[in-house]
Amino acid sequence: MTNIRKSHPLMKIINNAFIDLPAPSNISSWWNFGSLLGICLILQILTGLFLAMHYTSDTTTAFSSVTHICRDVNYGWVIRYLHANGASMFFICLFIHVGRGLYYGSYMFLETWNIGVILLFTVMATAFMGYVLPWGQMSFWGATVITNLLSAIPYIGTNLVEWIWGGFSVDKATLTRFFAFHFILPFIIAALATVHLLFLHETGSNNPTGISSDMDKIPFHPYYTIKDILGALFMMLILLILVLFSPDLLGDPDNYTPANPLNTPPHIKPEWYFLFAYAILRSIPNKLGGVLALVASILILILMPMLHTSKQRSMMFRPLSQCLFWVLVADLITLTWIGGQPVEHPFIIIGQLASILYFLIILVLMPITSIIENNLLKW
């Protein structure tokens, strides 16, 4: 008799994706973050669902409903802070996951990589709209500033912004539609993640060496299931420490003040995970130029396969490229820091230099370094 997990139509799919999947024998802990992202998504959908049961998407009651969740709902504060800090964990895992892809040349799986970039955009859009929902000062002004950037688009800009707002300013209509989109997008993300996985399983996983591992595969279960569980426990530990000891560490104090269209906060800034892009946006003194740089800073990932000039796929045996990669990481940390600082000297010039360096490393220095490494190896 055939095993039910190999014969049943549904179980067969799960079996081929998570149990009998042939996986490289040498993938390191950097490969854990895909499963961690899946766990983050499930956590966000579940906590979000319970929050939506008590939240009201109306400008007059939104702020009060969030306060009500924290004060009156059983363990509402835990659910709320799990959701808020869960988003931060989501982005930490996302950035590491993308960084792993860049370091080990995983972008050579074109379909998987492109779906991944689309996923990144979708998650960023979802997080932005979620930040607007508590209707605090930073929610309101963040929404106003970021949506207003679309007005930089020639000819249709102003109409587009008013269409998104549903009026002449961020108001009740904006909040309601943002809530609707924030609710539906995670399910679209889940569908895209399934497609992401589908394309990955067409080629099989990459590994740290960047060399085909077809001759040396091991079953996903039990080896990588247990490894993923360990990673998940570590992530949950960090998340629970954040939630239970300093839930507001990554938030903005301004968001504890109800939204007031007549009072602008001194420093409008998004959540920490958008600060690098915000710094790039601010470093260009022209509105349209800034918006284009902002979009380009993420969209540049799509160009990675075309910018790959090395004869080796992975950076594992390429010390010069490794140095550049870590300079890029340091540059992104610098941009994140600058994005949270006021627009004044010396932060302006640091931000501009860091922004130039970001594009310079990816578009110029990395491809040239790869060619130099090829020549050093006489390839």
Swiss-Prot record:
Question: GO:BP terms for this protein?
Answer: mitochondrial electron transport, ubiquinol to cytochrome c
Remaining remarks: Heme 1 (or BL or b562) is low-potential and absorbs at about 562 nm, and heme 2 (or BH or b566) is high-potential and absorbs at about 566 nm.
- Check the record and name the CDD domains matching this protein: cytochrome_b_C (cd00290), Cytochrome_b_N (cd00284)
Q: Identify the coding gene.
A: MT-CYB
Note the SS bond partners. none
Similarity comment: family membership: Belongs to the cytochrome b family.
InterPro entries in the record? Cyt_b/b6_C (IPR005798), Cyt_b/b6_C_sf (IPR036150), Cyt_b/b6_N (IPR005797), Cytb/b6-like_sf (IPR027387), Cytochrome_b (IPR030689), Cytochrome_b_C_euk/bac (IPR048260), Cytochrome_b_N_euk/bac (IPR048259), Di-haem_cyt_TM (IPR016174)
- Provide the binding site for a ubiquinone: H201
Species assigned in the record: Phacochoerus africanus
Listed Pfam families: Cytochrom_B_C (PF00032), Cytochrome_B (PF00033)
Q: Which GO terms describe its molecular function?
A: metal ion binding; ubiquinol-cytochrome-c reductase activity
Which parts of the chain span the membrane according to its record? 33-53, 77-98, 113-133, 178-198, 226-246, 288-308, 320-340, 347-367
Q: What's the record's note on cofactor binding? A: Binds 2 heme b groups non-covalently.
Cell location: Mitochondrion inner membrane
Quaternary structure, per UniProt, is:
The cytochrome bc1 complex contains 11 subunits: 3 respiratory subunits (MT-CYB, CYC1 and UQCRFS1), 2 core proteins (UQCRC1 and UQCRC2) and 6 low-molecular weight proteins (UQCRH/QCR6, UQCRB/QCR7, UQCRQ/QCR8, UQCR10/QCR9, UQCR11/QCR10 and a cleavage product of UQCRFS1). This cytochrome bc1 complex then forms a dimer.
Q: What is this protein called?
A: Cytochrome b
Principal subcellular localisation of the protein: mitochondrion
Q: Which GO terms describe its cellular component?
A: mitochondrial inner membrane; respiratory chain complex III
